[in-house]
């Protein structure tokens, strides 16, 4: 099968149902359309705890906390996209991040894709996010940034990652789905 997989980006705030939606879409596409579907979260591509510790020392302490662009292994994601599109598809092994230990699972627990998927669902809160214009980065936007990022080093680093590595990655998505909550208080309620 020389046909390239169709990449679906699925984003939304925490608690909007990204994982549930991607699971349902996967079931429908497999059962009713007989397609091979693989779904993975951007969370599985977080840098290891050690890599984030080094990043937090080198760039900014807030980068120890996983979540924002720059805390994922962008090269690993790009390699995955490239391998999945390859005419000579070979088995792909992808990381599985264990949030309970805040680190990548051992390789024996990684995802294994043995056949080329028809559809790949790539989900996460920041999937498809775009960089801000530099003029919007001139001041902190919340109390966390005001206290911990007064010189905007963290904010500018995250934005630069979006502008470069993540832009290259997201440009390869064939379509984007964004799940939007009616308001922020609903997200808080759904997370409880």
What are these regions (language model features)?
Residues 38-41, 45-102:
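Conserved nucleotide-sensing/catalytic segment adjacent to the nucleotide-binding pocket
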């Amino acid at each position: 099968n020389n046909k390239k997989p169709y990449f679906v980006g699925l984003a939304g705030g925490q608690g909007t149902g990204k994982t549930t939606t991607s699971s349902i879409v996967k079931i429908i596409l497999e059962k009713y359309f007989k397609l091979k579907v693989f779904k993975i979260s951007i969370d599985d591509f977080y840098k290891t705890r050690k890599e984030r510790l080094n990043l937090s020392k080198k760039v900014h302490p807030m980068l120890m906390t996983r979540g924002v662009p720059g805390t994922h292994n962008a090269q690993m994601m790009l390699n995955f996209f490239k391998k999945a599109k390859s005419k000579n598809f070979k088995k792909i092994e992808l990381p599985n991040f264990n949030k309970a230990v805040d680190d990548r699972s051992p390789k024996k627990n990684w995802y294994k894709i043995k056949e080329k998927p028809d559809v790949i669902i790539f989900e996460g809160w920041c999937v498809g996010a775009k960089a801000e214009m530099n003029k919007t980065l001139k001041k902190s936007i919340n109390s966390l940034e005001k206290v911990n990022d007064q010189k905007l080093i963290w904010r500018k680093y995250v934005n630069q990652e979006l502008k470069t590595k993540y832009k290259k990655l997201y440009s390869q998505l064939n379509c984007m789905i964004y799940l939007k909550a009616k308001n922020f208080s609903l997200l808080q309620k759904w997370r409880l």
